[in-house]
């Protein structure tokens, strides 16, 4: 029996493919960037055909790099940028418009009107999401209303909608299968996370014809066989999950109270709440963590707009550092008791503040303040914002006992220690940092028998380093109080 798994990791700026073995070890990788389109202010688009072409290219390259044949694969897992919306012609397979990306804000005014008309409570109750351009529903309606004849063709069943996973599945299987998984469906604002069905009332609210929608499967399932000409053999696509959900799986956060936080340009914190779909009273999102054997596991999620991007700004905008690794050296000279606060609200503040009008600020400056203090404040801002999320999660009644971290900033020991100190929980950094792709491989492996159980996957997770809290409670409280004061000033500017 073959023990290799191919993970497709289709992201916002690049498509990647990674081959893993049956121990979760990386065997080969390939990556290719693709174009971003910004036709108007606040609009972000992708060419869906370019996404497909780049994905196929990296799959072939990864197999070639690892000297592995497609016939050596037990299965394929797909993980993807969430919410991004593609609509295509079922007969020709051609998109009728560029894909509208999750970052796109073109439907903001309609979302505002829907909220003002009192519809948000329905959306929160059924989907766990807020009414926001971020999610797929209003993007779908925009395409139907702005491409000639699209709405009529959609109602006649001639068109198909999909998030990126569905689009890739359609192409990999030669147009035979129009399917998605429960995690991606849960990000559309059209899927009832309690009934695990597309919701007729939400379809009516957002004016989306049911004929457009894919069939919803478990996250580990037989989605369909690839066409032989794609990779050289027919391979079962056996797992699908949105990127943050796949990272939760890759981090083996399978028990309620387990959480992972991914530190890239921004930050996504997701906490497993088990069989309970916990409704947030603090404007966090409730989502499907994954669905296995027909049983959904739920999570609560908070997002920070600026994490690693704060260090990019200090490097490229202010030129205070020439490389991100210098930041830890500066922080070591300043220490944790830094009176300077950097609130990186460059595009407003995300969860739990949700203030689009907030703008960035550096507070606490004195004549003694130098580059080191400002750089350290940038690092600390990531940890303070994470504490904002954790506090909101706890206020919603969820437990958070430890935090597993991944992403670019997770390699910074100083930041991870300060994160543990300010949260007052252990912070665990895994040996394998490619957690998103690994999660997709795990799902495919569960379905194809490479992995027997979640317990086996849990046994494969290894901690490279655990950071434990080592800060006096009084200092922790005073530092965080200073942060809250800084945020209040920014929000009330």
Swiss-Prot record:
Family (UniProt): Belongs to the FGGY kinase family.
The name this protein goes by in its record: Glycerol kinase
Binding locations of sn-glycerol 3-phosphate: 12, 82-83, 134, 243
Function: Key enzyme in the regulation of glycerol uptake and metabolism. Catalyzes the phosphorylation of glycerol to yield sn-glycerol 3-phosphate.
Description of how activity is regulated: Inhibited by fructose 1,6-bisphosphate (FBP).
PANTHER family: GLYCEROL KINASE, SUGAR KINASE
GO biological process: glycerol catabolic process; glycerol metabolic process; glycerol-3-phosphate metabolic process
Catalytic activity: glycerol + ATP = sn-glycerol 3-phosphate + ADP + H(+)
Record gene name: glpK
Keyword ATP-binding: yes
Entry keyword annotation includes Protein biosynthesis: no
Binding site for ADP: 12, 16, 265, 308, 408, 412
UniProt GO cellular component terms: cytosol
Top-rank EC class of the record's enzyme: transferase
Organism phylogeny: Bacteria, Pseudomonadati, Pseudomonadota, Gammaproteobacteria, Pseudomonadales
InterPro entries xrefs: ATPase_NBD (IPR043129), Carb_kinase_FGGY (IPR000577), Carb_kinase_FGGY_CS (IPR018483), FGGY_C (IPR018485), FGGY_N (IPR018484), Glycerol_kin (IPR005999)
Pathway in which this enzyme or protein is active: Polyol metabolism; glycerol degradation via glycerol kinase pathway; sn-glycerol 3-phosphate from glycerol: step 1/1
E.C. number(s) listed in UniProt: 2.7.1.30
Gene Ontology terms, MF aspect: ATP binding; glycerol kinase activity
Binding site for glycerol: 82-83, 134, 243-244
Residues that, per the record, bind ATP: 12-14, 265, 308, 312, 408
Keywords (A to Z) from UniProt: ATP-binding, Glycerol metabolism, Kinase, Nucleotide-binding, Transferase
Disulfide bond sites: none
CDD domains the UniProt entry points to: FGGY_EcGK_like (cd07786)
């Amino acid at each position: 029996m073959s023990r290799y798994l191919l993970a497709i990791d289709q992201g916002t700026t690049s498509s990647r493919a990674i081959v893993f073995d049956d121990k979760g070890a990386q065997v080969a990788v390939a990556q290719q960037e693709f174009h971003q389109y910004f036709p108007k202010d606040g609009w972000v688009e992708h060419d869906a055909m370019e996404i497909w072409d780049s994905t196929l290219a990296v799959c072939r390259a990864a197999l070639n790099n690892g000297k592995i044949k497609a016939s050596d694969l037990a299965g394929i897992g797909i993980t993807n940028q969430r919410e991004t919306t593609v609509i295509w012609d079922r007969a020709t397979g051609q998109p009728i418009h560029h894909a509208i990306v999750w970052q796109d804000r073109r439907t903001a005014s309609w979302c505002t009107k829907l909220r003002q008309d009192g519809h948000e409570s329905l959306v929160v109750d059924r989907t766990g999401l807020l009414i926001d351009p971020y999610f797929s529903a209003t993007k779908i309606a925009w395409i139907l209303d702005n491409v000639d004849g699209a709405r009529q063709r959609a109602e006649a069943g001639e068109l198909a909608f999909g998030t990126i996973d569905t689009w890739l599945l359609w192409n990999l299987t030669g147009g035979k299968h129009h399917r998605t998984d429960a995690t991606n469906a849960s990000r559309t604002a059209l899927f009832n996370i309690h009934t695990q069905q597309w919701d007729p009332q939400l379809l009516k609210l957002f004016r989306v014809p049911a004929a457009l929608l894919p069939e919803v499967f478990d996250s580990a399932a037989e989605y369909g066989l690839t066409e032989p000409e794609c990779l050289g053999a027919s391979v079962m696509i056996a797992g699908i999950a949105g990127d943050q959900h796949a990272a939760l799986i890759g981090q083996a956060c399978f028990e309620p109270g387990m959480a992972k936080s991914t530190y890239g340009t921004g930050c996504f914190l997701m906490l497993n709440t088990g069989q309970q779909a916990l409704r947030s009273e603090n404007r966090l999102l409730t989502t499907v963590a994954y669905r296995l054997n027909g049983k959904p596991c739920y999570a609560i999620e908070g997002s920070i707009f600026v994490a690693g991007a704060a260090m990019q700004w200090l490097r490229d905008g202010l030129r205070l550092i020439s490389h991100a690794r210098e930041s830890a050296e500066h922080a070591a000279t300043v220490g944790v008791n830094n009176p300077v606060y950097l609130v990186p609200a460059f595009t407003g503040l995300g969860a739990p503040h949700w203030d689009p009008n907030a703008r960035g600020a550096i507070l606490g400056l004195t004549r003694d303040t130098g580059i080191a203090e400002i750089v350290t404040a940038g690092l600390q801002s990531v940890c303070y914002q994470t504490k904002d999320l954790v506090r909101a999660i706890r206020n919603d009644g969820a437990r958070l006992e430890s935090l597993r971290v991944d992403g670019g900033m997770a390699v910074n020991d100083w930041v991870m220690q300060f994160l543990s100190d300010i949260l007052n929980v252990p912070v665990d950094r895994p040996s394998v940092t490619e957690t998103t792709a690994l999660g997709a491989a795990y799902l495919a492996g569960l379905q194809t028998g490479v992995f027997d159980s979640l317990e086996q996957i849990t046994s494969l997770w290894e901690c490279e380093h655990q950071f434990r809290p080592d800060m006096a409670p009084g200092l922790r409280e005073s530092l965080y109080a200073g942060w809250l004061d800084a945020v209040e000033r920014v929000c009330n500017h």
